[in-house]
Amino acid sequence: MGKKDKRWVMQRKNDFYYKLAKQNHYRSRASYKLLQLNEKFEIIYEGDNVVDLGCAPGGWLQASYDLVGEDGFVIGVDLQKVKPLREENIVAIQGDMTKKETINKIIDLMPSKADVVICDASPNISGVWEVDHSRSIELSLMALIATTHLLRKNGNFVVKVFQGSLFDQYVQLLTKYFKKVQTTKPKASRSVSAEVYVIGKKFLGKKFDKNTDFPIIKLIEDNEFLDRYIEETHEKKEGNETSDNDEDNNKNGLMIKKIKELRGKRSKL
């Protein structure tokens, strides 16, 4: 383990919410983000049916159970297999929330339509700001699309989004589907994190319309941010060609290659 990794492990172990989660047997410090969000915005109530999109490792499942109690029901889905929880009214399934068969399976397992849909999922991090933001927006859009099939009218929605150039447009998009939309960063979020939580209250019952909401999707599909990053990186590389810093030039070249590979792998919505 390198020095950087050791430092990260020590910082994590000394983190207040990490230690608190351990003490209270939560699987993740993120449990406190949901509890704080709920305290401020009153999203989840006792007896609610809750769907958790991207639920691994299960911290939000546990927090949701604490909020809904024995009369509620919580179901989570994730690409990874999630270790089962002991409570009978918490179910975790393995699946892709973007697939119709996964949505249908969730619907079949639920006693009724969801009162609340939550999503604390993060994309695979590349280390390139605009790439990660673009991926986060894609993931948040997928969560919204799934939510329009799972959530009852007047239900609530919570989703994590990374800050960036498309953030405001995503928030604006949610106003078409929810009567009230708010944004916040709970105390349990690390100050260095780019994450912001968007809360949609009172779902209007509309299905996602790709034709109506095409502008934000087109911006992602056109890879506008990746194009701009590559262009800027090329300019920096050309500016460094007269210097002796070959290491920086090599890093820039590798980053451009990495972004192009990422672009090729990205799936369309």
UniProtKB/Swiss-Prot annotation:
<keyword id="KW-0808">Transferase</keyword>
<feature type="binding site">
    <location>
        <position position="96"/>
    </location>
    <ligand>
        <name>S-adenosyl-L-methionine</name>
    </ligand>
</feature>
<dbReference type="InterPro" id="IPR002877">
    <property type="entry name" value="RNA_MeTrfase_FtsJ_dom"/>
</dbReference>
<feature type="compositionally biased region" description="Basic and acidic residues">
    <location>
        <begin position="258"/>
        <end position="269"/>
    </location>
</feature>
<protein>
    <recommendedName>
        <fullName>Ribosomal RNA large subunit methyltransferase E</fullName>
        <ecNumber>2.1.1.166</ecNumber>
    </recommendedName>
</protein>
<feature type="region of interest" description="Disordered">
    <location>
        <begin position="234"/>
        <end position="269"/>
    </location>
</feature>
<dbReference type="GO" id="GO:0005737">
    <property type="term" value="C:cytoplasm"/>
</dbReference>
<dbReference type="InterPro" id="IPR015507">
    <property type="entry name" value="rRNA-MeTfrase_E"/>
</dbReference>
<feature type="binding site">
    <location>
        <position position="60"/>
    </location>
    <ligand>
        <name>S-adenosyl-L-methionine</name>
    </ligand>
</feature>
<keyword id="KW-0698">rRNA processing</keyword>
<keyword id="KW-0489">Methyltransferase</keyword>
<keyword id="KW-0949">S-adenosyl-L-methionine</keyword>
<comment type="function">
    <text>Specifically methylates the uridine in position 2552 of 23S rRNA at the 2'-O position of the ribose in the fully assembled 50S ribosomal subunit.</text>
</comment>
<comment type="similarity">
    <text>Belongs to the class I-like SAM-binding methyltransferase superfamily. RNA methyltransferase RlmE family.</text>
</comment>
<dbReference type="GO" id="GO:0008650">
    <property type="term" value="F:rRNA (uridine-2'-O-)-methyltransferase activity"/>
</dbReference>
<dbReference type="InterPro" id="IPR029063">
    <property type="entry name" value="SAM-dependent_MTases_sf"/>
</dbReference>
<feature type="binding site">
    <location>
        <position position="78"/>
    </location>
    <ligand>
        <name>S-adenosyl-L-methionine</name>
    </ligand>
</feature>
<feature type="binding site">
    <location>
        <position position="120"/>
    </location>
    <ligand>
        <name>S-adenosyl-L-methionine</name>
    </ligand>
</feature>
<dbReference type="InterPro" id="IPR050082">
    <property type="entry name" value="RNA_methyltr_RlmE"/>
</dbReference>
<dbReference type="Pfam" id="PF01728">
    <property type="entry name" value="FtsJ"/>
</dbReference>
<feature type="binding site">
    <location>
        <position position="58"/>
    </location>
    <ligand>
        <name>S-adenosyl-L-methionine</name>
    </ligand>
</feature>
<keyword id="KW-0963">Cytoplasm</keyword>
<feature type="active site" description="Proton acceptor">
    <location>
        <position position="160"/>
    </location>
</feature>
